[in-house]
Amino acid sequence: MKTSVLFVIFGLALLLCLSFAAELEDTGRQCGEFMWKCGAGKPTCCSGYDCSPTWKWCVLKSPGRR
């Protein structure tokens, strides 16, 4: 039982560290990808994406979109 609790705690700690590292990598980008917050003061969307005027995040370009 104690071993199981330790595995859960270490697993959660590892997950937290990995998500933190991924977040640091994302903030180093010069443009936003899918579901990235965009708008005033934020990086522009990468090529192939547009900033949604409604939701203010990067979405895939579509032929019908202005």
UniProtKB/Swiss-Prot annotation:
Pfam families: Toxin_12 (PF07740). Keywords: Disulfide bond, Ion channel impairing toxin, Knottin, Secreted, Signal, Toxin. GO terms for molecular function: ion channel inhibitor activity; toxin activity. GO terms for cellular component: extracellular region. It comes from the Eukaryota. Disulfide bonds join C31-C46, C38-C51, C45-C58. SUPFAM superfamilies: omega toxin-like. It is found in: Secreted. InterPro entries: Huwentoxin-1, Huwentoxin_CS1. Expressed by the venom gland. PROSITE patterns: HWTX_1. Residues 22-29 form a propeptide. Residues 1-21 form the signal peptide. The presence of a 'disulfide through disulfide knot' structurally defines this protein as a knottin. Probable ion channel inhibitor. Belongs to the neurotoxin 10 (Hwtx-1) family. 29 (Jztx-13) subfamily. This is U10-theraphotoxin-Cg1a 2. It comes from Chilobrachys guangxiensis.
